[in-house]
Amino acid sequence: MVSIHNSFILLMLMISICFCEKCLTNEECDLKWPDAICVRGRCRCSENTIRKKSASREWVCLATNDATGNSGPPLTCPTPEGAGYQVMYRKDGEPVKCSSKKKPDTCPEGFECIQGLSILGALDGVCCPDRAKTCVHPIFDHPDDGYLSRWGFDGEQCIEFKWNPERPSSANNFKTRAHCEDYCIGSINGITNYHQSNFHLF
């Protein structure tokens, strides 16, 4: 009797693991990451982006090009798209590399290891702000020379601002309001554990 009960629990656990990332529509994927589409029950990142695992978001899309359209660096963070290299955790000015396969993660609190675009070897990733820390980064508004519309979380809601990708930025930078709201308002309970004073650009 006990073994049947344990087998049933194991079966239910396997079903929940198998179906936790299933998608039915393009809209639900697009909400989680702009322009992602649902292909055979799995969200697929758009052209010029690659899907990578994320401990705080399940998955993220990394841009293969920088925000100006040129080939991007092999190590980058998911946001801001095309300029994620600006927000990597650094020590003595150098990006802190990590292993995306090692558990637990070796990144400091508030950061998670995101695998690079084309990096091989034991240290195949870089420490990026996790979901909660991303949402408490300051918004870098560039009203004078910003030419791209972006959205950032101000602690209460997502607001629109102008962004110049060639100037310093923070991870609190999203292409769409829906992406900002899903990223930040969807995890608002975890956000209160972080403070803006923990933010360091480099």
UniProtKB/Swiss-Prot annotation:
Tissue specificity as recorded in UniProt: Expressed in larval and adult hypodermis, hermaphrodite vulva and adult excretory cell and duct.
Residue pairs linked by disulfide bridges in the UniProt entry: C135-C184, C158-C180
Signal sequence coordinates: 1-20
Effect of S56L: In 518; blistered cuticle associated with abnormal localization of collagen col-19 in dorso/ventral annulae and lateral alea. Loss of struts separating the external and internal cuticle layers
GO biological process, one term: protein catabolic process
Domain of life: Eukaryota
Keywords per UniProt: Disulfide bond, Signal
Keyword Transmembrane recorded: no
Pfam families named in the record: Kunitz_BPTI, Lustrin_cystein
Reported phenotype of the disruption mutant: RNAi-mediated knockdown causes blisters in the cuticle and abnormal localization of collagen col-19 in cuticle dorso/ventral annulae and lateral alea.
Listed GO MF terms: serine-type endopeptidase activity; serine-type endopeptidase inhibitor activity; structural constituent of collagen and cuticulin-based cuticle
Domain BPTI/Kunitz inhibitor as annotated: residue spans: 135-184
InterPro entries: Cuticle_assoc_divergent, Kunitz_BPTI, Kunitz_BPTI_sf, Lustrin_cystein
PANTHER family in the record: PROTEIN CBG15282-RELATED
The protein's role, per its UniProt record: Appears to lack serine protease inhibitor activity in vitro when tested with bovine pancreatic alpha-chymotrypsin and elastase. Involved in cuticle biosynthesis.
Name of the protein: Kunitz-type protein bli-5
Species of provenance: Caenorhabditis elegans
